[in-house]
């Protein structure tokens, strides 16, 4: 089977006092999601999976609508910092931003539940998608750290920050029910040339 793993499109910034931030896509992000659907609509996608976070749901919706599919939402695909009360796209942060300072002091602070728990959660979620979709092509809409840590695990890399996907970057993984995984491509962004 083939996993087509897509990082969500560009979201808005959001700050909340009543719980975790879960921002919607920005106007540019909505255009990126449409461009991604344009590309993937012709690729034989049988099933669409998203994380439970709004930016991933909204990124996957155009493809699901075009294909007449109901997306499956998986809690296990949430981003590593899902508990934060604010979200700012990294491009909008300066060196003094709280998240950047925390990351520079302790890169693993990005993982709300700890790195190992995050790695195990996302790997289990993606393994479950593979097990339930033998012989199918599944588009999975999720987050930068989900993509990065999954690839880090598959490729045997030591640093969870070595591989980072762009907004709507497409990564392809061939996956067999026997457990063999083969990374076929990483961070395809040609469909976004006019939308970055």
PLM region descriptions:
Residues 35-101, 181:
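Phosphate-coordination/substrate-recognition cap region in phosphate-metabolizing enzymes
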Residues 62, 149, 153:
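Active-site signature of alpha/beta-hydrolase-fold catalytic machinery across serine-
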Residues 3, 136-144:
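Generic beta-sheet signal
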Residues 3-62, 111-122:
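Loop-to-helix element that buttresses phosphate recognition and phosphoryl-transfer chemistry
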Residues 72-73, 80-91, 131, 136, ...:
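Acidic, low-complexity terminal tails and accessory targeting/binding regions
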Residues 55, 146-147:
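Alpha-helix capping/helix-boundary segments
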Residues 97-117:
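Short glycine/proline- and acidic residue-enriched helix-loop micro-motifs
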């Amino acid at each position: 089977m083939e996993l087509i793993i897509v990082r969500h499109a560009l979201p808005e910034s959001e700050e909340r006092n009543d719980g975790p931030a879960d921002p919607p896509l920005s106007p540019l992000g909505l255009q990126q999601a449409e461009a991604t659907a344009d590309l993937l609509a012709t690729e034989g996608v049988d099933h669409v999976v998203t994380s439970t976070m709004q930016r991933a749901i909204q990124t996957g919706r155009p493809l699901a609508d075009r294909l007449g599919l109901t997306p499956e939402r998986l809690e296990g695909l949430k981003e590593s910092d899902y508990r934060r009360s604010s979200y700012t796209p990294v491009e909008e942060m300066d060196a003094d931003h709280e998240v950047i300072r925390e990351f520079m002091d302790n890169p693993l602070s990005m993982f709300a539940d700890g790195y190992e728990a995050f790695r195990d959660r996302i790997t289990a979620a993606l393994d479950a998608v593979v097990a339930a979709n033998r012989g199918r092509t599944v588009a999975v809409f999720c987050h930068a750290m989900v993509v990065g840590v999954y690839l880090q695990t598959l490729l045997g890399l030591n640093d969870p920050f070595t591989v980072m996907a762009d907004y709507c970057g497409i990564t392809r993984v061939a996956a067999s029910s026997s457990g063999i995984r083969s990374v076929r491509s990483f961070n395809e962004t040609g469909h976004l040339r006019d939308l970055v």
